[in-house]
């Protein structure tokens, strides 16, 4: 089921009648969401420049740059990576060539060095646990809570909008919606509940109420029809997703304690 939902959300988005290939959404307070196919990033427009998150790909980054220039003539000063997977962080060279600095958690630099891709720009600035990119009266705060979808994924809070940007590990508005491809070899499922609970606590401390997803989620009707879900959702979705993992681990543990093998447990659950 999770494979079907992941495929439906990322690949089939292009087949939804009336769904534009790209979309630009003004979220307020200088924060914008850009969607290309089933992928989404956010960017902040400030009086001193623009902060862009995941460039998505070389082709998508060109469209993103054009969209930014319809809003402001300020240059892109920073590109922030959510993690190290190529399908999100490819394409930053167009911004690097214009002087932007790339920011990522320190393990992303190692991953990119060990598994290079010609379209992935290595980070210029790395950090361990937290880094805040500040331009004008805006900031993008990057937080690392340990390994999750890869070993360098971060969540980001855009201010003053105070919205959380989350990639791959969950898609709002429904916290129960499965993340994208949980079978990735560098997924660290053991830490997923802790990562999400730490993110939930962060939102509580910051007073944030809204989450922006790094992927387009789809509402699937009883007849199999698919309609695009909203790009934002309640912070509660983070806690719901943490609960999903906690319950799943508990079910697996209970079944294995009853004698189920790793092959039998999924069928029993």
Show the residue positions of the predicted features.
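Bacterial N-terminal signal peptides
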Residues: 1-7
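Divalent-metal coordination cores built from histidine and acidic residues
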Residues: 86-146, 150-154, 201-210, 255
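Metallo-beta-lactamase
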Residues: 49-50, 57-59, 132, 139-141, ...
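Boundary at the C-terminal end of the N-terminal hydrophobic targeting segment
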Residues: 8-13
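C-terminal regulatory/interaction regions
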Residues: 257-269
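Active-site metal-binding motif and surrounding structural segment of the metallo-beta-lactamase
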Residues: 24, 47-51, 59-103
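Divalent metal-coordination and catalytic microenvironments
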Residues: 30, 44, 54, 68, ...
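Conserved beta-strand hairpin/beta-sheet module of binuclear metal-dependent hydrolase folds
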Residues: 21-67, 154-168
């Amino acid at each position: 089921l999770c494979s079907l939902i992941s495929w439906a959300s990322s690949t089939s988005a292009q087949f939804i009648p009336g769904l534009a290939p790209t979309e630009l959404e003004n979220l307020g307070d200088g924060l914008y969401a850009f969607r290309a196919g089933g992928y989404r990033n956010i960017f902040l427009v400030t009086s001193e420049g623009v902060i862009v998150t995941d460039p998505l790909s070389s082709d998508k980054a060109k469209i993103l740059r054009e969209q930014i220039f319809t809003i402001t003539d300020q240059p892109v000063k920073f590109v922030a990576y959510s993690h190290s997977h190529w399908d999100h962080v490819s394409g930053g060279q167009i911004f690097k060539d214009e002087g932007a600095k790339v920011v990522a958690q320190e393990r992303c630099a190692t991953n990119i060095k060990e598994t290079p891709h010609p379209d992935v720009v290595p980070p210029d600035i790395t950090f361990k646990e937290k880094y805040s990119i500040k331009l004008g009266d805006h900031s993008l705060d990057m937080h690392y809570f340990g390994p999750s979808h890869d070993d360098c994924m971060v969540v980001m809070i855009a201010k003053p909008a105070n919205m959380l940007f989350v990639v791959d590990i969950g898609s709002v508005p429904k916290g129960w919606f499965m993340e994208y491809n949980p079978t990735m070899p560098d997924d660290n499922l053991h830490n997923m509940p802790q990562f999400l609970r730490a993110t939930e606590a962060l939102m509580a401390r910051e007073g944030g109420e809204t989450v922006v997803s790094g992927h387009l989620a789809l509402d699937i009707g009883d007849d199999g029809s698919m309609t695009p879900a909203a790009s934002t959702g309640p912070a509660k979705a983070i806690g719901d997703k943490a609960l999903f993992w906690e319950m799943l681990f508990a079910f697996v543990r209970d079944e294995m304690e009853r004698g189920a093998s790793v092959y039998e447990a999924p069928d029993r659950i």
